[in-house]
Amino acid sequence: MLKLSPASMTVTGLRQTMTSPTVPPSSNTPAGNLIITSSSSNSGSNSGSNMSSGNMTSSNLTNLSPSHPAGLNALASPTSPSALLLAHQQHLLQQHQQHQQQQQQQQQAAALQLAAVHPPAHHLHKTTSRLSNFSVASLLADTRPRTPPNQAADGPQNLTSSAATSPISQASSTPPPPPASAAAQVPANTFHPAAVAHHAHLLQAAHAAAAAHAQHQAMAAQLRQQQQQADARANSPPASTSSTPSSTPLGSALGSQGNVASTPAKNERHSPLGSHTDSELEYDEEMLQDHEADHDEEEDSIVDIEDMNADDSPRSTPDGLDGSGKSLESPHGPPPGSHMQSTILSPAALASGHVPIRPTPFSALAAAAVAWTGMGGGVPWPGTRQMPPFGPPGMFPGAGFGGDANEPPRIKCNLRKHKPNRKPRTPFTTQQLLSLEKKFREKQYLSIAERAEFSSSLRLTETQVKIWFQNRRAKAKRLQEAEIEKIKMAALGRGAPGAQWAMAGYFHPSLMHLG
């Protein structure tokens, strides 16, 4: 039995089939009062209850008089509970569709406004990381619609989906009110609380589904906007042919500064060394230590040895000029020493690609110790070819690397042109190598006086002797470690009882002659 009270409504029982006859409103029934008759399963008697006009008073229910037949047609038998539920579901569905359309229009307007305010991402950003520049919160920040939502036919029409057809309670989830135009077109129907209570279990799920659908729509609009921006950037011609072009003035400035800063470091590897031997007056000890530590670059240099018996060669001067006042000329013809400083960093000289950039005191003598392995060991150095040396041949006495004016003449070393990243290398004669090896077996470290005397006897510079001893000690260490590794592997393979002693490193002077 369905009991309807003026203050509240409780559902105590429903018939299995909602086929109760409907009572049309008569002329003696006051407007706003509704009489509902239902059959009871216990007594079988019909009981009617008159409701006051305060419970179901709305703009539509007050028009149920015989003089207003349009109200009856719009509500389609309002006295039936099934008709009430159906009408309520249709009304909530229309409100939900309008709400979704408003959200979509607001999101599209916010996305267009955000794209107009913020410029597209820089070219240095990767394509996969462009999603981090936008977010749903930024898209939903401005919720003011630009155009009135008057397109009611664009909403989702799938009535089988629970998210679209489930009614939403106006008490638990309050959607934003529609604009005035939409409110004027759709009448605001107020339904009986029984219809709302009948579907209370679906309210929370419908609200969650609607929120998820709105978020999905926002993400789809965002992805479409980003795809359009990516297509526009892909169709535009690139500003430069570099892998990471700079599209902003700040990026261009940073790129130019990086190029200028990296140019001396790149070209310093293949700078030719003429007779500029007093470089210690210009370059500090830090550059010398950096070149000594860079042993990987020491093995890519070749230097020619000039005639050691020519005693009448002109003396070198600190500015890189010989006695006749002529500067050393490379095969490409660099300018004289007076104009060298201004020509080094000029754009034309840098564009040519073959102007020497700042020769270092260590570049010509960096790999002096590894040269004898190709000559005395019987293994030729790969990539070497005979080319005529350039520059005035002869010996140069006087102030060299760390020497004074009282030292005897030394060997003049000139660069042979190979490839841009190749550094000069000093090939020693067989007699010099034998003397160096003999001295190394006697003493691995030379004092300053011993090094000066020994270099004078071999007609080498002190720097050449010093670097040769450094590389020879490194080679002896590598050979010693390789020999120890062989002993360890042999002991472990045999499983000898003394294998634990083979694991400990040891040093024996007899290993120094290997090589």
Curated annotation (Swiss-Prot):
GO cellular component: nucleus
Keywords: Developmental protein, DNA-binding, Homeobox, Nucleus
Tissues with expression: Dorsal lateral ectoderm, developing central and peripheral nervous systems and the somatic mesoderm. Expressed in dorsal and lateral muscle preclusters and mesodermal fat body precursors.
CDD domains: homeodomain
Chain intervals with Low complexity compositional bias: 17-65, 160-173, 214-249
Compositional bias ranges of the Polar residues kind: 7-16, 254-265
BP GO annotations: brain development; central nervous system development; dorsal/ventral pattern formation; dorsal/ventral pattern formation, imaginal disc; ectoderm development; embryonic morphogenesis; glial cell development; imaginal disc-derived male genitalia development
Top-level lineage group: Eukaryota
NAD recorded as keyword: no
Region annotated Disordered, chain positions: 1-76, 90-113, 142-185, 214-279, 307-342
Function field: Plays a key role in the specification of proneural and promuscular cluster formation. Required for the specification of dorsal and lateral muscle progenitor cells. Regulates development of peripheral nervous system derived from lateral neuroblasts.
Name of the featured protein: Muscle segmentation homeobox
Gene, per the UniProt record: Dr
